[in-house]
Amino acid sequence: RGAGFLADPEALDHFLEEVFAHGDQKISVKTRLGKYHPEEFEEILAVYNRYPLEELILHPRTQQDFYQGRVNLGAYAYAREHSRNPLCYNGDIRCASDGKRLMEQFPGTDTVMLGRGVIANPALVEQMEGRAGEELDGEERGADADRVLQGEGGGGCAGGDKGGEGEEVWLGVFVGHL
């Protein structure tokens, strides 16, 4: 439950082994760096690297950090260098300039998962796409929401994973593509 597996990488490995042994669904995982210490991430990432994840969504804080303090961008850089799976960034994108700074610091980052930032600012995706100030009517805004929820525009982080018989399994709160 939650970040519980992060304290026991062996149990996480066993769980993922079972998941991948019993299905051919695309699986994305949202993770933190560890339960208590960022140094736990190296071992946790080694576990994730044993499996063909559709995407690894990284919130670069520990579970104990909750949402306090700064995200650990050094750990995100480590993940970019060492992850065998596609990577999605999650954490502290509250305004378009936060997304821009992330892109400048980490060129090639093209997917982010937005959480509290988009709840506080529902226009955040539009602002990140450079459409700030555009007046969208209800139909256009609904079409934008549908596009994001269906994952159009590329990348697994935008929608969800395909479940059995074409069914969508939504795994995130809200995601935007930069």
Predicted regions: what they are:
Residues 1-178:
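Flavin-dependent oxidoreductase catalytic cores
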